[in-house]
Amino acid sequence: TRTEPAAPQGGEKVRTNNIAMIVPQRFITLDLPFLRKCMGGICIMADQRGYDLMLCYASNTEYSQLQRQLANHKVDGVILTYAMADDPCIELLRQYETPFVLIGRSEDKTIPQADNDQVAAACEMTRILLQLGAKRIALLVGSTIYAVNTDRIRGYLRGFAEFGVPVDQRLVHSGVESAGQTLDALEAALEQKADCILCGDDEVAFEVMGELRTRHILVPNDLRVASLYDSSMLASITLSVSAVQYDAEQLGKTA
């Protein structure tokens, strides 16, 4: 005779052996090496512990997929691959009392976090570029609703402050989330006589390098380009871009 598993008693939860990895909705159409490597690290550790990985897309306004997974008890835990101000997903996870960890930095120290020091990295890169002779460094980063981008701006400003050089705020461009916005920010930076473009990540740097080639602007002879995240995407096109290196796979394993 076949014995059916007993139903959970009271508030007891049924173990699913599934972990959800939440990815920002806007990343669906992007090929981001950071996320791929991070996912690889998560998969390795999940497999070692007998868990499977489920993907879940969410944004600050759309999180129905996560809500459905939680309501139907599909996952035992969740990994958020980004840190965002006032993230509704965090409140939802707390309502369902689901364990979760954040890849990124949050001011809420009750949230388990795995992160790289973005402020220190951006500060150090800015100082190095200033030491190399750059004077007008334009910064191109994504939306400041994400902590990683506010941290990169803070590090950039700190780098100038530590070097004793004033910052031209016209060279700071945030909200760069698409190829079109990248080209607009680059155009504005060139109009402001930037001698270096510091990109928030490899995707922005890739777009910048492509446009500079189109304009026959030589890197680094005519203009320096640097990125606050390195990847195979950049290595495949040029060796002339200075970039910060992080071990995204290890970050995923830690989470």
Describe each region flagged by the PLM:
Residues 1-17:
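N-terminal helix-turn-helix DNA-binding module of bacterial transcription factors
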Residues 14-127, 131, 187-192, 203:
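Alpha-helical recognition/docking segments in bacterial nutrient-uptake
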Residues 19-22, 138, 198, 226:
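Short, well-ordered beta-strand segments
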Residues 46-57, 157-182:
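Short beta-strand elements in bilobed, periplasmic/extracellular small-molecule ligand-binding domains
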Residues 57, 104, 141, 171-174, ...:
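Residue-level recognition of beta-strand->loop/alpha-helix junctions
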Residues 114-139, 154, 158-162, 178-187, ...:
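Hydrophobic alpha-helical segments within soluble ligand-binding/sensing domains
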Residues 135-137, 167-171, 219-225:
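Short acidic capping loops at alpha-helix termini that bridge into adjacent secondary structure
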Residues 183-255:
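Flexible loop/turn connectors
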